[in-house]
Amino acid sequence: MSQSPKVGFVSLGCPKALVDSEQIITQLRAEGYEISGSYDGADLVVVNTCGFIDEAVQESLDAIGEALTENGKVIVTGCLGAKSSASGSNLIEEVHPKVLAVTGPHAVGEVMQAVHSHLPKPHDPFVDLVPAAGIKLTPRHYAYLKISEGCNHRCTFCIIPSMRGDLVSRPVAEVMLEAENLFKSGVKELLVISQDTSAYGVDVKYRTGFWNGKPIKTRMTDLVAALGELAAQYGAWVRLHYVYPYPSVDEVIPLMAEGAFKGHVLPYLDVPFQHAHPEVLKRMKRPANAEKVLERVQKWREICPDLTIRSTFIAGFPGETEEQFETLLDFIREAELDRVGCFAYSPVEGATANDLDGALPDEVREERRARFMEVAEEVSANRMQRKVGKTLKVLIDEVSAEGGIGRTAADAPEIDGVVYVEPAAKASKRYKVGDFVSVKITGADGHDLWGEV
């Protein structure tokens, strides 16, 4: 029997791109290809790229160059694959003309066609059964669940719609089947992602689907309720990311706070507010009423006191005045957001914000970002201190002789903080990766917690 062909894989970018990579690798394995852990052991290499900001573009171009140098046979996919150069030609083909093929994002079929052209699939392979959950690039105990592709918004700083297109929602039964397979495979935390989670179903007019004989609308609230019910059967968590602040978000908060879903639909919202001043938000083409946002945040916390709110912001957007930036700082202090990230505005090729007047010098943008983070970290530290002395449920991510590292319901993997857990003193309290344990919090800083089982 001939040896199975081997494909190397490089995955860059956000969790949405990671899911694309998982789907491609799942298909490769289903067709009998092996995945190589090195360039020299691969017959060709697939590079899944990111093209959102300049740093990501350069990282992707460098990765393609490295793969060409080390292997020589490279297929490129992902967001950067859809990007044109200043001359109008494909950017990747212009910089790296020796690549075998280039596709855009969410293009499993096109990638497989390119692989078949340059590395025919085995005719008589002994194919391992691919698990129903597919091939995952995350640890076994958590996984990303992508519910839609694309975005209908046209934020002036963003080029995602030009690369991934308008919103296309996955059928609700398909999403639920994938979620069930993931839970069956041992996943303890499901992270729901998309470009715009709140808009799920808008493109199909909230069409009714069916799962296990029950009708479920293709709508965020209905999907979250169904996922919460399913997660409860497996003692698992569901976490929501990329939740655009539509009014419909208000309907999800009670699912986090009460009834059968409490403890399974996590009291956690990742809501990208981006700014707080109405004029800046208007220039960004974002919802523009900070006072209403504050009212909503207060109402959310009244309904669900344990709610954690994560958000991202942009400092130094074109035309932002010092007064407008101070409004943003006041908003951060008053809203008391738990987890906050901030980017100094950086022009992205193809974004309409590049045409706005009032571009700020690099040093002003960076200085405002630093001031923003100073305020945000102070707010975060105060909120973290309130957890000292409490006993929290923690999902263990790592275990060593020094103890464990895990996360609470308030912490998404890779972007939020962690809990450093002391080694278990008794055999009955020992834990392993993927376990839920009760941890008494003994210390905190602005980002992480410390505790003991």
Curated annotation (Swiss-Prot):
One Pfam entry name: TRAM_2
Needed cofactors: [4Fe-4S] cluster
CDD domains documented for this protein: Radical_SAM (cd01335)
Catalytic activity: L-aspartate(89)-[ribosomal protein uS12]-hydrogen + (sulfur carrier)-SH + AH2 + 2 S-adenosyl-L-methionine = 3-methylsulfanyl-L-aspartate(89)-[ribosomal protein uS12]-hydrogen + (sulfur carrier)-H + 5'-deoxyadenosine + L-methionine + A + S-adenosyl-L-homocysteine + 2 H(+)
Superkingdom per UniProt: Bacteria
InterPro entries: Elp3/MiaA/NifB-like_rSAM, Methylthiotransferase, Methylthiotransferase_CS, Methylthiotransferase_N, Methylthiotransferase_N_sf, NA-bd_OB-fold, Ribosomal_uS12_MeSTrfase_RimO, rSAM
Iron among keywords: yes
SMART domains: Elp3 (SM00729)
Radical SAM core domain location: 137-382
Localization per Swiss-Prot or TrEMBL: Cytoplasm
Enzyme Commission number, as recorded: 2.8.4.4
Chief site of localization: cytoplasm
Residues noted as binding [4Fe-4S] cluster 1 in the record, renumbered to the chain: 14, 50, 79
Segments forming domain TRAM: 385-453
Keywords recorded for this protein, A-Z: 4Fe-4S, Cytoplasm, Iron, Iron-sulfur, Metal-binding, S-adenosyl-L-methionine, Transferase
Every MTTase N-terminal domain range: 5-120
Function: Catalyzes the methylthiolation of an aspartic acid residue of ribosomal protein uS12.
Family from the record: Belongs to the methylthiotransferase family. RimO subfamily.
Protein name (record): Ribosomal protein uS12 methylthiotransferase RimO
Species of the source: Burkholderia cenocepacia (strain HI2424)
